[in-house]
Amino acid sequence: STRRETAMCDACVIESVKQRMVSRRGLLRAAAVGTAGIAAAGMGIVPPALAAGHGSVTDLTHELHEEFPTFFGQQQFFREQKFKYAEHKFNLFELRVNEHTGTHVDAPLHFSADGLSVAELPLDKLIVPLCVVDIREKAAADPDAQLTPDDIKAWIAANGDIPENACVAMLSGWSDHLGSDKFRNADTAGKMHFPGFHVEAAKFLIEDTRAAGIAVDTLSLDHGISPDFAAHYAWLPEGRWGLEAAANLDKLPAKGATLVLGAPKHRGGTGGPARVFALV
């Protein structure tokens, strides 16, 4: 009888400990969530609960590799394997890359004497509403086509005002040509032919909206044949950023998506390859 009572008491103790552990775990989880929320708020990061309305994620980043086409027509991404798994039991590559290679961000410093570096871009300007302006029809007819103020005004008429801190993206369909010479589309004289932003479109966004960034699915914010980088010089010195060689813009709605720009953070950088995606 005594043994049975002892065993029963032991079982009670074990069950009591289990219940306490469960309660403690719940408390710790709640504390962790609360602490994480406070930390996130302090860092300016949007808590997951605020993003619960998004149902899908679209990758807007092309895979970067040695043969990725570049504005200058020369290789800009290099890698050398320093450690191999077969020999060292881990793999490691050393990279050398031009900042403006692949899907990448242009910081204001890229086209100004003292603009913000890529490391200084404010977080609230990197998670923004995305407005996709579709110019595929005229880009198919003319590779030198430009996104104009009229294109933006037509978007506004159909979708409403450009939201504060938005990224206005040009969808020209040019990413379909990636992997062929038509992506650069250089003529016999070496001049490239692909769509981009008209300088007046950049000025319109500066003067009439509070957009934070512009994006293109080509190699440059300016169209390929531009002799003077007019859109770059109008846009970037105003403290705004640009995104070049974006992927999958055709998979997004004209409005309603949220762009997340995973910009690099190297000191004094004029830009850099970025991991970019959209929440829809």
Q: Where are these predicted regions, by residue range?
A:
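Active-/binding-site microenvironments in catalytic and ligand-binding cores
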Residues: 2-280
